From Swiss-Prot:
Lineage summary: Bacteria, Pseudomonadati, Pseudomonadota, Gammaproteobacteria, Moraxellales
Protein name in the entry: ATP synthase subunit alpha
Catalytic reaction list: ATP + H2O + 4 H(+)(in) = ADP + phosphate + 5 H(+)(out)
Source organism of this protein record: Psychrobacter arcticus (strain DSM 17307 / VKM B-2377 / 273-4)
Gene designation per UniProt: atpA
Sites marked Required for activity: S374
Family statement: Belongs to the ATPase alpha/beta chains family.
Database matches in Pfam families: ATP-synt_ab, ATP-synt_ab_C, ATP-synt_ab_N
EC number, UniProt record: 7.1.2.2
Length: 514
């Protein structure tokens, strides 16, 4: 029988102890003391940062929003029903990040950037912080390039430039989403990448939007970020910031991007819900005191940045190119009340607003743009030459027509000049109507506006304006394709182009029916 050597055994044990790497890691952990309505109170997380990701058991994450003396209030980004009092919570030392890059184009993702379209994983090479500081004054460049929405009424009267924030505001069912989707569809030839953020909407509505983008081929250059009505308030609050980060990826690399927030009223409601559950003091309309900052820090990130900023950001890889992120936030009003708390906030943050009116919508004027109180504060500098030259009198004609039409109801006999003005206004109103999902190119808009300005519509019955426009544009594409291409390519306006447009109108009216 083999004899055991105690010295050998003790040496082996000593060797094992010396070789043992316990791998002690310092972890900042706390204990959940309360869970309710998607809000978690955690005791013991002393080093938590504001906005830091908190990890719970079962791979559930949260975000620290309230840093109190002896506890941390966090919102749960996911299913809070999995959490229980007494479970551990850990600091991650990371601020919330989402995947960014061209890999997200053509995909539908949730507020955290996870794919929800059943097309497999997104192999994004980069992630970026959801909350970022907007570019400073020195890094910016003035807005002087257009974003064509394809709407005659918008591109002529309320032009939008690259890097602008233009609010779309109106009651429910006035065509706000339709206008934003058309603006995305109109970017097919412009090279502008798009992000559509759906906040607090029904899933069926979002599915219809995605289907329409797919049918028109617009999904190829668009990312859809979804935080539907059935998702926690925390995700509805974060979704716009996530979408903005995805859009900024293109802006910072010298490209142009367009982001639609549909709509920020629901984000404000979600943030109000979170704030009240975190026991923050309510203010006007029960919104928290920082609801203005909620939207201002988001919309300030939409900007046009100069070539020096892009060159510095890309470490000299992209030289001599400016980048832009254009925002179209949507706000829903109640009974046309634009002086409510959130609408006035967003109006004061943005560079103009397109006001859609339910009375115009119901009377068949679609898009239902109220030309009187819709403005674009910086877009005028970005308008293309031909549209700027031709569209000068349209806003005036419409505003005067509305005023005179109201006055004419009470007057029995009108002088010829007034009657002429009313007739012209009626035709311009009819001309500004446009079908959904049919954005118009620069040449198409220029052709029909020229016809209106030069009096070619004066003898066309009002009810036939639409069919005249369709037939004339068909004729222009068939017979004057070179002229249309020249206008689209150069966007210039000179005597030669004016003469050719005039000749084409005279020929069309003589030889074609409508």
């Amino acid at each position: 029988m083999q004899q055991l050597n105690p010295a050998e055994i003790s040496n082996l044990i000593k060797q094992r102890i010396q070789d043992l790497d316990a791998g002690a890691t310092a972890k900042n952990e706390g204990t959940i003391v309360k869970v309710s309505d998607g809000i978690v109170q955690i005791h013991g997380l002393e080093d938590a940062m504001y906005g830091e990701m908190i990890e719970f058991e079962g791979e559930v994450y949260g975000m620290a929003l309230n840093l109190e003396r002896d506890s941390v209030g966090a919102v749960v980004l996911g299913d809070f029903l999995k959490l229980q009092e007494g479970q551990k919570a850990y600091c991650t030392g990371r601020i919330l990040e989402v995947p960014v890059g061209p890999e997200l184009l053509g995909r539908v993702v949730d507020a955290l950037g996870n794919p929800i379209d059943g097309k497999g994983p997104i192999n994004a090479k980069m992630t970026d912080k959801v909350e970022k500081i907007a570019p400073g004054v020195i890094d910016r460049q003035s807005v002087d390039q257009p974003v064509m929405t394809g709407y005659k009424s918008v591109d002529t009267m309320i032009p939008i430039g690259r890097g602008q924030r233009e609010l779309i505001i109106g009651d429910r069912q006035t065509g706000k989403t339709a206008m934003a989707i058309d603006a995305i569809i109109a970017q097919k030839a412009s090279g502008i990448k798009c992000v559509y953020v759906a906040i607090g909407q029904k899933r069926s509505t979002i599915a219809n939007v995605v289907r329409k983008l797919e049918q028109t081929g617009a999904l190829e250059y668009t990312t859809v970020v979804v935080a539907s009505a059935s998702e926690p308030a925390a995700l509805q609050y974060i979704a716009p910031y996530s979408g903005c980060t995805m859009g900024e990826y293109f802006r910072d690399r010298g490209e142009d991007a367009l982001i639609v927030f549909d709509d920020l009223s629901k984000q404000a409601v979600a943030y109000r819900q979170i704030s009240l559950l975190l026991r923050r003091p309510p203010g006007r309309e029960a919104y928290p005191g920082d609801v203005f900052y909620l939207h201002s820090r988001l919309l300030e990130r939409a900007s046009r940045v100069n070539a020096a900023y892009v060159e510095k950001f890309t470490n000299g890889e992209v030289v001599g190119k400016t980048g832009s992120l254009t925002a179209l936030p949507i706000i829903e009003t109640q009974a046309g009340d634009v002086s409510a708390f959130v609408p006035t906030n967003v109006i004061s943050i943005t560079d103009g607003q397109i006001f859609l009116e339910s009375s115009l919508f119901n009377s068949g004027i679609r898009p239902a743009v109220n030309a009187g109180i819709s403005v674009s504060r910086v877009g005028g500098a970005a308008q293309t030459k031909i549209i700027k030259k031709l569209s000068g009198g349209i806003r005036t004609a419409l505003a005067q027509y509305r005023e005179l039409a109201a006055f004419a109801q009470f007057a029995s006999d009108l002088d010829d000049a007034t009657r002429e003005q009313l007739d012209h206004g009626e035709r311009v109103t009819e001309l500004m109507k446009q079908k959904q999902y049919q954005p118009m190119s620069i040449s198409e808009q220029a052709a029909v506006i020229y016809a209106s300005n030069e009096g070619f519509l004066a003898d066309v019955p009002v009810e036939k304006i639409g069919s005249f426009e369709e037939a004339y544009l068909r004729y222009m594409h068939d017979e004057q394709a070179d002229l249309m291409k020249e206008i689209d390519d150069t966007a210039n306006y000179n005597d030669d182009i004016a003469g050719r447009l005039k000749l084409s109108l005279e020929t069309f009216k003589q030889n074609h029916s409508y």
